[in-house]
Regions:
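Extended, well-folded catalytic/binding cores that form a central cleft or groove in large enzyme
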Residues: 1-170
Length: 170
């Protein structure tokens, strides 16, 4: 038996929502340039294409398949860990310890950039996922898959059409 309904449902993983809401293309995503550290273009509406790659971005790799509802918690934990790692510089007592910290500094800076990017992406996604329209759409989809009576679902679908929901959402 082939399941034709599931591919039509809204994806609820972090990577899936990024794709559905922001539109990924072959792993690339167009984002506001200020999200990736281009401070000189902040507020100008400039965009940059970035590659979301779990092999090069450990934070993305750790949240990409998670339900979007827990991504905020994971980003918060990553921020606390990063802050703790930066504070490790105060624990250096010898030249070797200082050298080890300096050697880790590049990794810490890339982790900071990744955290900033994924925090901005998550904030952008929340603008969509916190809407009444999004919750209504999920409710209709879940009721349809659960086998709820069809008459109220058809009425809900009509309501989505009346609200001007994009065709692909319905």
């Amino acid at each position: 038996m082939v399941d034709l309904a599931t591919p039509m449902l809204t994806q609820l993983t972090y990577e899936g929502l990024v794709d559905e809401v922001m539109g990924m293309s072959s792993g690339f995503l167009e984002v506001d340039a200020s999200w990736v550290g281009a401070a000189q273009s902040a507020g100008t509406g400039a965009h940059r294409k970035i590659r979301l790659d779990g092999a090069q971005d450990a934070l993305f790799d750790s949240v990409r398949d998670d339900n979007f509802a827990i991504v905020g918690e994971k980003l918060h934990a990553a921020a606390k860990q990063l802050s703790s790692d930066y504070e490790g510089r105060h624990q250096t007592n010898t030249v070797q310890e200082l050298r080890a910290f300096v050697n880790r500094l590049g990794t810490l800076q890339s982790g900071h950039s990744s955290l900033r990017l994924h925090t901005c992406i998550t904030e952008h996604l929340l603008q969509t996922t916190n809407t009444e329209h999004f919750h209504f759409l999920l409710e209709v989809q879940q009721n349809l898959v659960a086998g709820a009576p069809i008459a109220p679902l058809l009425q809900a679908i009509d309501e989505l059409v009346d609200l001007g929901a994009p065709f692909l959402d319905i």
